[in-house]
Design a protein with these regions (language model features):
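Conserved Walker
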Residues: 121-124, 164-169, 185-186, 202-219
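Short, intrinsically disordered, mixed-charge
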Residues: 117, 151, 198-205
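Conserved AAA+/SF3 P-loop NTPase catalytic/coupling segment centered on the Walker-B
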Residues: 177-201
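Terminal, non-catalytic protein-protein interaction segments that mediate quaternary/complex assembly
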Residues: 51, 60, 148, 187, ...
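Short secondary-structure junctions
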Residues: 12-15, 155-157, 204-207
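N-terminal nucleic-acid engagement/recognition segments and initiation subdomains in replication
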Residues: 1-88, 99-103
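Short, well-ordered alpha-helix to beta-strand connector turns
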Residues: 175-177, 220-221
Length: 221
């Protein structure tokens, strides 16, 4: 189809597997931008200027097809890292939390490994799932500590805006973020704690949004 060939010649599209957003860049480039309504209209008008009948319907079908590449920002960040130099940085990070729990460092280390494994779609045995609970006075920096656990390029996939009274919202947050912080966990809606534990222990969460659209589990590396 002439319209599809035009798209493949002029731009590269990829789908963010976390947010569901479609990004585009000029063919051969790597400066990906969000495919907004304005960007869609520009593509259609530029195609028409070259005599190509690219319609909004064709573009929409192309965007929501398996012909474009899935992109996992967490995988990209992990792949950009240098080979590990043998330095245990996780222990230093864990020691920023003052605690009397002698197992804290070991458990924190295991939790971080589980978190990164989930980012890449790897299975985590449910009986071994760990969820840290940090307890302390207000203003001690508990939430701030959680916020800096992700590198700057991935911090848009962190949230502490969770309402436990909404199961649908929690489901969506689990599949669209890399790190969730349930702030004031003991202060609000503790009767839903079992549901939260269930959601966070699933190694392959699936969210079905309105109108029957399903976000599938993220693929493994």
């Amino acid at each position: 189809m002439e319209a599809l060939n035009y798209l493949k010649r002029h731009c590269s599209l990829r789908r963010n597997v976390l947010s569901g957003e479609t990004m585009f860049a000029p063919q051969g480039g790597d400066d990906y931008q969000l495919l907004t309504r304005e960007a869609r209209n520009t593509l259609i008008l530029e195609a028409a200027n070259e005599g190509i009948a690219l319609t909004d319907e064709t573009l929409e079908r192309f965007v929501h097809s398996t012909l474009i590449t899935d992109w996992n920002p967490a995988e990209e960040w992990l792949d950009s890292l240098d080979a590990w130099d043998g330095t245990d940085r996780v222990t230093d990070l864990a020691n920023r939390i003052i605690t009397s729990n002698p197992d804290w460092v070991a458990l924190f280390h295991k939790w971080m490994l589980q978190m990164v494994a989930r980012w890449t779609g790897r299975e985590v045995t449910q009986r071994d799932t760990i969820v840290p609970v940090i307890v302390g006075q207000y203003g001690y920096g508990k939430t701030s500590f959680c916020n800096i656990l992700l590198p700057p390029s991935l911090r848009r996939y962190y949230t502490d805006q969770i309402k436990l009274r909404s199961n649908a919202e929690v489901h969506e947050l689990v599949v669209t973020n890399l790190l969730l912080c349930i702030d004031e966990f003991y202060q609000e809606h503790t009767d839903q704690a079992p549901a939260v534990r269930y959601l966070l222990s699933r190694s392959t969460p699936v969210f079905r949004s309105a109108y029957g659209v399903t976000r599938l589990p993220r693929r493994p590396m």
